[in-house]
Amino acid sequence: MKANSKFLHLIERIQEGHIITREECEFLLSFDERSLEAGITRSIADNLSRQVFNNKGFIFGQIGVEVAPCPGRCKFCSFSDEFTTFETFSMDDNAMYEAADNFTASGELFALSLMVMHNTSFDRTLDIISKIRARIPAKTQIIANLGDFSRTQANELKAAGANGAYHVWRLGEGCDTRFTVEQRLSTIESIKAAGLDLYYCIEPIGPEHTPAQMAEIIMKGLDYECFQHGAMRRVTLPTSPLSKYGQISESRLAQITAVVTFVAIHSPQIFSIGVHEPNPLGLMSGANAIYAETGANPRDTESETLGHRGLDIEACKRMYAECGFDIS
């Protein structure tokens, strides 16, 4: 069996430094995950990524500080007040410190993401960030993961100790969520204006999403010069109205991660490529960033994700070792 000739020509150009277009991104995503073309895509992305990032893998961590039934009602999120099984809970300072200490003890954590609810008060968010900033090593970056916010608030996040923020134009925005694309992009613009690093990815990917839909959102991360790009699949939640679609395989996620790598790898602003949730196929397809997790997790139905869907630092290190990475 021979690979598609148009595909092979594009792959050769990518290896020579070509930055792919939206149409080429869509083309690469159109191949079946079991195809020869998908296998080549993953292999070349892995090789390019290891060259550009010097074979370094980065460990990130996320603490889900709060959980509550959320009026945002994202159909893919376990916090949605339409179908959540969670009750309201917020970590106290001691619990936050313990989680932060566990993540940073080995000195191998590049950045710690602090996740709050969409409607957590902004003052509470600033308080969490400032307390953790004072607690953890100065070299460890802090990522803010919260709802939409203004340019003024972005400046306040930075002043409190945040180095970056995670924010995404999500698949199904405005249909599977109660938020508009304009709201999400306005917040991304606020992040960039404040000088915060933009953490971005294509998510939450389901089997129903088309190559055209994915390509549009993938390319938007490049338009905004994201610091980290990546790919995240939607996890099926039994009570979610999206459960009827099921979820993509890790093989398909790896293929999409590889295409994201092609899009982002030549950007001077890109620091790493993430795959969520962590898995070896993704790390062998261009990704070099994975997250350990504790506390609440919007892809989990357990109030403590660590030991359920979430990995700890040691598990992340073992996964990197199995995939032949050097941990930065």
PLM regions and their residue ranges:
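Alpha-helix N-cap and loop-to-helix initiation/capping positions
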Residues: K2, M91, R124, R178-Q183, ...
